[in-house]
Amino acid sequence: VSQSPFFATDIGAPEGPVALPDGSLYVTEMSAGTLRVTHLTPDGRRRVVLRTGGRPNGLAIDGDGMIWIAEAGLRALIRIAPDGRELMRIEGDGSERFCFPNDLAFGPDGHLYMTDSGLALDDFLDGQDFAEGFMDFDWDGRVYEIDPKAGKVLRTIDRGIRFTNGIAFDAQNRLYANASFPGDVYRYDVFGSSAPSREFFGNVLQPDKRSGFKGPDGMKFGLDGRLYCTVYGQSNVTVLASDGSVADRLMLQGDAPTNCAFARDGQTLLVTEVGVGRVEKLSVPCGGLPLHYPKVG
């Protein structure tokens, strides 16, 4: 029996994959008719966890098995139980609202780190499409550190980024976030400094003749120390070596990958793709660097 290259198909613009120990997967669905968090099993079953009503983007789970949603449409970070009950909602840092919560990564300190792309959806979308000239708008993308127990923003690590998107920690506990428009990945020494500087790490864009938007999206570290970054509009996962250089480009069947998660049981990267609406399985040379799952209570 040949293995299908797809974990799931016919999903409404999937994002935010979170691999669970039993082989199943949480994803968000961002298409206009879905707007929900969905649980997918390898044998094809699916369960709607919650219709959020906004536009859910990135996801993370904590050590209690609760789900954190970066809700771009509602401009909120929301914690829910697996049955869909809302447990907490954070809408800003006390002085200003979030604009576009995008993606999430728990740190080794038990705090939750979140990217905010830097403009509200209504300010750069024209219907379902990007408004004309959107890349030149006044983007104020941010990286936040959040105390999940208290439900409050502790610090803004960076801002003024042109569409902050993917976020991940490496094995040395350094934080990485990417900027979709320039294609850059930045690194922050969040535990070595109270005001860490933005350090250029690498760039994932490749020169090609394609028109249309291309840019880095969700990303994860492998046990090989390399960063696996989905590149929307580029049909690949671009792999950056530990020095930030491009080590590989893993081609996908779909043009528009949005995010990825390593399966818990081995050398498979699960990639969400919004062009066709499916989760693609990619063979990779290693497992994923274990994520942090702090108990929040």
Segments the model singles out, each with a brief description of its role:
Residues 2-8, 44-50, 85-94, 152-158, ...:
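A short beta-strand motif characteristic of beta-propeller blades
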Residues 186-258:
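Glycine/small-residue-rich hydrophobic helix-like segments
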Residues 40-44, 81-85, 147-150, 189-193, ...:
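Short loop/turn segments that connect beta-strands within beta-propeller blades
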